[in-house]
Structures are given as structure tokens and as C-alpha cells.
Curated annotation (Swiss-Prot):
Lineage: Bacteria, Pseudomonadati, Pseudomonadota, Alphaproteobacteria, Hyphomicrobiales
Coiled coil: none
PROSITE patterns: RIBOSOMAL_L31
Organism of this sequence: Azorhizobium caulinodans (strain ATCC 43989 / DSM 5975 / JCM 20966 / LMG 6465 / NBRC 14845 / NCIMB 13405 / ORS 571)
One term under GO cellular component: ribonucleoprotein complex
Family listed: Belongs to the bacterial ribosomal protein bL31 family. Type A subfamily.
Keywords: Ribonucleoprotein, Ribosomal protein, RNA-binding, rRNA-binding
Full protein name: Large ribosomal subunit protein bL31
Length: 74
């Protein structure tokens, strides 16, 4: 196996949407960084039964509806 080709694998702190924190190993950032989640298993529609509204991050949902809205109504 080649040396120095793999990313650094270190501990980071992950903060869930409800403020719960846990430590895990990741290649994200650097040792001790914090990753704050916008959506997690407790709030994602796939795991909550789809009762929450989809967040329109950066207008992506709006652009999709504008582009493909006619197909969705069909």
C-alpha cells in the first residue's frame, strides 16, 4: 500500500439539529473541528414519515419546480 495517499482520519465533533453532540472519526476538516448538521436522521423526511416540509436550500426546490413543474401536474 502506498504511503501518504490517504486523507487524515481524525476525531471531530458532530452537532445534530437538536443540539445533541457526539464525537466520531472523519476526514472532514482537521482534528477537533465541529460539523453542524442542517438535517439529520431525527429531522429527515425519509426517517420521520415525510411529515416535515422540505427545506429550500439555495432555491433548488424552486428551480426544480420551475423547470419540471408541468411534468408534475400531468
Amino acid at each position: 500500500m502506498k504511503s501518504d495517499i490517504h486523507p487524515d482520519y481524525h476525531f471531530i465533533k458532530v452537532v445534530m439539529t437538536d443540539g445533541t453532540e457526539y464525537t466520531t472519526r472523519s476526514t472532514f476538516g482537521k482534528e477537533g473541528d465541529t460539523l453542524a448538521l442542517d438535517i439529520d436522521p431525527r429531522t429527515h423526511p425519509a426517517w420521520t414519515g415525510g411529515t416535515q416540509q422540505l427545506l429550500d436550500r439555495g432555491g433548488r426546490v424552486s428551480r426544480f419546480k420551475n423547470k419540471f413543474g408541468a411534468l408534475l401536474k400531468g
